[in-house]
């Protein structure tokens, strides 16, 4: 069975997420654990947790297809000690929120080294991950591939490998592949041969077991542009034919897909329908 969904709003509480996921035709989802544009976050209220978990059972959502996405302000690669400390503190709280909700996976962007260099940035990332994962043992952290702009770390599989290889708790680390980010970073996932090379490299560096989620997005920009601008399914430079190559691969079909395309739930419902149409799923 294809597991597909979208990034869902949490306004009004986490309790709304399972039902709204079902209403857009999904059986997987991603959420923010708090307002992503604020440093402040709170643990969910007991009633919200209870109703959320009841909804998960009612709508038969696979626990392996539920994902939290870290807030925008976190930068655990930062050379600025104040920013790094605040990022670490919020990351630990996000892991607690995930655990409270019964969500196993937290997706994070590795962060930007802010001109301090990749090596220094990776060292900062490792310090943060090791500390956070020592304190919170129930949450798996997934490193998302990103585009190279702004000193971002993780635009290549090699950089993600460096982090996981040196981490203290590699068994609780995995990766998320964002199709827009991969395409914009120069990985041609629209070509069968190149896609196989990409997946073989993932298997060689991490094992495919580490690939836990796909962020399924089209791209507004060309291959290798390093822009990171998501587009709705079939309307971008990856396009319907390119996405068909990617999502038709049997290995990709084993992994949950979450859309982060522009628009609200109604738009995401149409995007999910478009994905299934591309796959020729009735």
Curated annotation (Swiss-Prot):
Zn(2+) 1 binds at residues 69, 109, 144. GO terms for molecular function: deoxyribonuclease IV (phage-T4-induced) activity; DNA binding; DNA-(apurinic or apyrimidinic site) endonuclease activity; phosphoric diester hydrolase activity; zinc ion binding. PROSITE patterns: AP_NUCLEASE_F2_1, AP_NUCLEASE_F2_2, AP_NUCLEASE_F2_3, AP_NUCLEASE_F2_4. Keywords: DNA damage, DNA repair, Endonuclease, Hydrolase, Metal-binding, Nuclease, Zinc. CDD domains: AP2Ec. Binds 3 Zn(2+) ions. Zn(2+) 2 binds at residues 144, 178, 215, 260. Its cofactor is Zn(2+). It catalyses: Endonucleolytic cleavage to 5'-phosphooligonucleotide end-products. Its EC number is 3.1.21.2. It comes from the Bacteria. The keyword ATP-binding does not apply. Pfam families: AP_endonuc_2. GO terms for biological process: base-excision repair. HAMAP family: Nfo. NCBIfam families: nfo. This is Probable endonuclease 4.
């Amino acid at each position: 069975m294809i597991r597909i969904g979208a990034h869902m709003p949490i306004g009004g509480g986490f309790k709304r997420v399972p039902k709204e996921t079902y209403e857009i035709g999904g059986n997987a989802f991603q959420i923010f654990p708090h307002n992503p544009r604020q440093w402040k976050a709170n643990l969910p209220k007991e009633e919200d947790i209870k109703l959320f978990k009841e909804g998960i059972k009612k709508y038969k959502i696979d626990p392996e297809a539920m994902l939290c996405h870290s807030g925008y302000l976190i930068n655990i690669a930062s050379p600025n000690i104040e920013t790094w400390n605040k990022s670490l503190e919020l990351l630990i709280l996000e892991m607690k929120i995930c655990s409270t909700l019964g969500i196993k996976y937290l997706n994070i962007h590795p962060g930007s080294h802010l001109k301090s260099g990749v090596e220094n940035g990776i060292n900062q990332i490792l310090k943060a991950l090791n500390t956070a994962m020592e304190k919170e043992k129930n949450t798996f952290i997934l490193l998302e591939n990103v585009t190279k702009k702004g000193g971002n770390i993780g635009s290549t599989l090699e950089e993600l490998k460096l982090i996981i290889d040196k981490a203290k708790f590699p068994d609780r680390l995995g990766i998320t592949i964002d199709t827009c980010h991969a395409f914009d970073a120069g990985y041609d996932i629209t070509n069968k041969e190149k896609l196989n090379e990409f997946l073989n490299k993932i298997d060689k560096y991490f094992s495919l077991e580490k690939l836990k989620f796909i962020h399924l997005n089209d791209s507004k920009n060309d291959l290798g542009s390093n822009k990171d601008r998501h587009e709705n399914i079939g309307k971008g430079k990856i396009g319907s034919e390119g996405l068909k190559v990617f999502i038709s691969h049997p290995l990709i079909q084993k992994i949950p897909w979450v859309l982060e395309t522009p628009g609200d739930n109604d738009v995401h419902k149409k995007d999910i329908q478009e994905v299934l149409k591309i796959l020729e799923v009735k």
